[in-house]
Design a protein with these regions (language model features):
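Adenine nucleotide-associated cytosolic modules
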Residues: 1-138
Length: 138
């Protein structure tokens, strides 16, 4: 059973009928993904329809955000209340030297949009707390 078949059974990301067709540019961009039998075009449509919220735009969140954007995840949310520091640059690959002193979520959002302008980025310059979790995760 492919991931698409399991998604149909489990109802993940909605039914195939509700998925918007990929544009010509998206078909070209994600052609290699669509060749994978477990993904195909409908799987790429589901990836585009998905939403991911990353807590932290640092050492782990930074590369994850880039790979998610490259894969075509439709919406990437970022939560981080920190600023880019020069000591971050050797391991937080989403940030550039010019971003030092800027909020990490702003720097990361800019890099994500540069990599894949079709991805919606929602930046939250805050920490995830019990008080704001429902609003941020909802």
């Amino acid at each position: 059973m492919s991931a698409v078949d399991r998604s149909d059974r489990d109802g993940a990301c909605g039914s195939v009928e509700r998925l918007r067709p990929l544009s010509r540019d998206e078909l070209e961009r994600y052609h290699r993904n669509a060749l994978v039998p477990q993904v195909e075009v409908v799987g790429q449509q589901r990836i585009r329809a998905s939403r991911v919220l990353l807590i932290g735009a640092g050492g782990l969140g930074a590369p994850a955000a880039l790979y998610l954007a490259a894969a075509g995840v439709g919406t990437i949310g970022l939560i981080d209340d920190d600023d880019v520091d020069v000591t971050n640059l050797q391991r937080q690959v989403i940030h550039a030297t010019a971003a030092v002193g800027r909020p990490k979520v702003d720097s990361a959002a800019e890099a994500i949009r540069a990599l894949n302008p079709d991805v919606e980025v929602v930046a939250h310059r805050t920490r995830l707390t019990a008080d704001n979790a429902r609003d941020l995760l909802g």
